[in-house]
């Protein structure tokens, strides 16, 4: 089968002829229709320090996808051949305290599809049936293929009450932009998103952000004043992993504010903890999606009218995968879809 593999320990991704995966007793065999390129895939392409320390070579990569069930193990229940599915990319152990307690997203033994095990950039993917999510008929393949990053946005945004609140999002990558759309949809008042990438700030504005602020040109405090905000942001969503962005968030949070952190700093990050203490801030780390509450919320949000389709800016056939990676690496894109049909 066709597949995209991290074939060598250097910059790049390669098209290979890979063996079709075998189906275990509790597995689904999925024929891939569409995949999306994640920021993680770009890290793997670039072969940065994280990738060098994490990714086995060679390995098929990719973890954002939608496809059709074409085979299943003899123990699988609840799925039929022809079901349209996406899937949770974090494969959990089922045995640790968090898994047994129903907090599977906090499994300490998580293995990532396309990160620690064979991924979805292939004509066929095998995953445990437990990890598959049936896609409702009224949700398109395009949207279903980005449920993984959309889930990061939903999990982060819905960590705290947003109704009538003022929200600051630092980092206008695709996940931050989708989070802005979620915040507005569920009833936040002002949703301000910051970055230095004009292309993505414009995209965030289209997706519902009250203000998209280029912090290289405009002060966040001036924007707050223009919006009539006198006491700071109630909720912060840190999506960038950039220390200066987090420092700015701490400066502009209201007392008693709540921060959800999804962005991963490149290394240790020093902050002024006195601001956290004296403001009484709550900081929550976010990793992945809640299994599977976030997945049901994603489907329900779209079915209730949330439109995240503008975040998808490019489509390529799988044979044009290099153009897709070039678009993602340029920073001048939203989500990039690769078509396998």
Curated annotation (Swiss-Prot):
Any one Gene Ontology molecular-function term assigned to this protein's record: L-threonine 3-dehydrogenase activity
Reaction equation(s) it catalyzes: L-threonine + NAD(+) = (2S)-2-amino-3-oxobutanoate + NADH + H(+)
Residues the entry annotates as binding Zn(2+) 1: 38, 63-64
Needed cofactors: Zn(2+)
Single Gene Ontology BP annotation: L-threonine catabolic process to glycine
Assigned keywords, A-Z: Cytoplasm, Metal-binding, NAD, Oxidoreductase, Zinc
Keyword Transport part of the UniProt annotation: no
Name listed for the protein in its UniProt record: L-threonine 3-dehydrogenase
SUPFAM superfamilies: GroES-like, NAD(P)-binding Rossmann-fold domains
InterPro entries tied to this protein: ADH-like_C, ADH-like_N, ADH_Zn_CS, GroES-like_sf, L-Threonine_3-DHase, NAD(P)-bd_dom_sf, PKS_ER, Zn_alcohol_dh
Gene designation per UniProt: tdh
């Amino acid at each position: 089968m066709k597949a995209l593999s991290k074939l060598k320990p250097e910059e790049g991704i390669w098209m290979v002829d890979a063996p079709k995966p075998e189906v275990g007793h509790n597995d689904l065999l999925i024929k891939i229709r569409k995949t999306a390129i994640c920021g993680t895939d770009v890290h793997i392409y670039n072969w940065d320090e994280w990738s060098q320390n994490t990714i086995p070579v060679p390995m098929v990569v990719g973890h954002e996808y939608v496809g059709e069930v074409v085979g299943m193990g003899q123990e699988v229940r609840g799925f039929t051949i022809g079901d349209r599915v996406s899937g949770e990319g974090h494969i959990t152990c089922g045995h640790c305290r968090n898994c047994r307690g129903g907090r599977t997203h906090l499994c300490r033994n998580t293995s990532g599809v396309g990160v620690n095990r064979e991924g979805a950039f292939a004509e066929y993917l095998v995953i445990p049936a437990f990890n598959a999510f049936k896609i409702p008929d009224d949700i398109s393949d395009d949207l279903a293929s980005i449920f993984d990053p959309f889930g990061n946005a939903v999990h982060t945004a819905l960590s705290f009450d947003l109704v009538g609140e003022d929200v600051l999002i630092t980092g206008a990558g695709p996940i931050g932009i989708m989070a802005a759309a979620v915040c507005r949809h569920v009833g936040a008042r002002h949703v301000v998103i910051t970055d230095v990438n004009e292309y993505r700030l414009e995209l965030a504005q289209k997706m519902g952000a009250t203000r998209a602020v280029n912090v290289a040109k405009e002060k966040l405090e001036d924007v707050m004043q223009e919006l009539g905000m006198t006491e700071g942001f109630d909720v912060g969503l840190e999506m960038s992993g950039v220390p200066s962005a987090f420092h700015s968030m701490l400066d502009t949070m209201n007392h008693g504010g709540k921060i959800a952190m999804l962005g991963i700093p490149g290394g240790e990050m020093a902050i002024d903890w006195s601001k956290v203490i004296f403001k009484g801030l709550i900081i929550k780390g976010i990793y992945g999606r809640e299994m599977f509450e976030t997945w049901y919320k994603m489907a329900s949000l779209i079915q209730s009218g949330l439109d995240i389709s503008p975040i998808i800016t490019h489509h390529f056939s799988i044979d044009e995968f290099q153009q897709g990676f070039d678009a993602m690496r340029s920073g001048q894109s939203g989500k990039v879809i690769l078509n396998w049909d």
